[in-house]
Amino acid sequence: MKIFFLIYFVLTIPVFGQVFNGMTLFSPAQGGGGGGNFYSYLVDNEMNEINTWTHPRGPASMPYLLPDSTLVYPYRVPTPSMNAGGTGGGISKYSWDGDLLWDHVISNSNYQHHHDVEPLPNGNILVIAWEMKTAEEAYAVGRQSIDNSLNVMWAEAIFEIEPVGSDDVNIVWEWHIWDHLIQDVDPDLPNYGVISDHPELQDINYGSAGSNGGPGGANGDWKHLNAIAYNEELDQIAISSRHHDEIYIIDHSTTTEEAAGHVGGNAGKGGDYLYRWGNPQAYGRGNTSDHLLDDQHGVNWIPEGYPGEGNLILFNNNYTNNSAVFEIVTPLNDDGTYAISEGQPYGPGEPLWLHTGNFHTQMQGGAFRLPNGNTIVTDCDDATIFEVTHDHEEVWSYDHGAGQVFIARAQKYELNYLG
């Protein structure tokens, strides 16, 4: 395998300046995720192999390296119960030596894992999943149309799972968007209200309920969540919706019962949105000039001690004719809520820091702040990873250069990260 690796990466072109000295982790994938073996690579700045893991199935998103050297790998199952862009279904844990420690599949008639996961400090894992809803269930809560021949609507759920044994889980917490809806079309149906008065709720009629095209054919994909991140200090979760051009923050300090309602948790709001940003027209506020996100991916908090700590950073896939990285300062209050003026959208009105250039991807993509203030960026479609300074100087780059291959997102870890 090592000989293969060295040949495979002959096209690597590192550029050195103020580059952060760390270890980069990524999992290249072919579209569809089937056929042959797949690999996760951990490399240094000169693309020397530190470790490689082999997988029988292609990645759904990016892998995660834990401080104990365990690799968490979300992957695409062969026959998903719900199939659209970003379909996953399986989550594996591997030892440093490549032994499979645990493997669990979430792909059934009710739920289908897709895209991202987020390992938690307590050893549990947050998982994004589509939740199957029939047209009748959608109409019963005020949905006006179903936009696919399957006559279904895929809602979204988040599960916190505790790995058990070699292939089982305990579900220790869960959240469902279906518990936080609003509609303004029928006062005789549940959740009736004025959309713009309730930015904490999701308009059931915003956006299309799936389509008859795209990867996998007809689907009920409504919001298309594509990334999830966790902030331990706040005990909050950030998620990204490509189809609605928004990012959201919800409270994780709630019980599962509280997460299904509108009160409880540290912020006192239950499972309602604490914050949302990118497209305030989705909740009846603002105008087209406030619509700042377009098909974004990869939202995450900048860690404590890093330049910009506590801010959110994300990959905005469509910005003018390219893609861009946004860093935003959220209007966080001391009590864990987020400030918003009556009738106005959530701030900020613009990013604190924005990096763009000659890169553009329609699929996935991501950005992470590094300890020295640099940012590592992944152009998914071009299978390219690069590092830029705060002043927009590109100091390191890598082009996978392997044809019909993409890299969802890459992360870079400190050299002393592993315990």
Give residue ranges: language-model regions.
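Sec-dependent N-terminal signal peptides
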Residues: 3-14
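Short linear sequence motifs
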Residues: 1-2, 168
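Histidine-/acidic-rich catalytic cores in large beta-rich domains
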Residues: 17-419
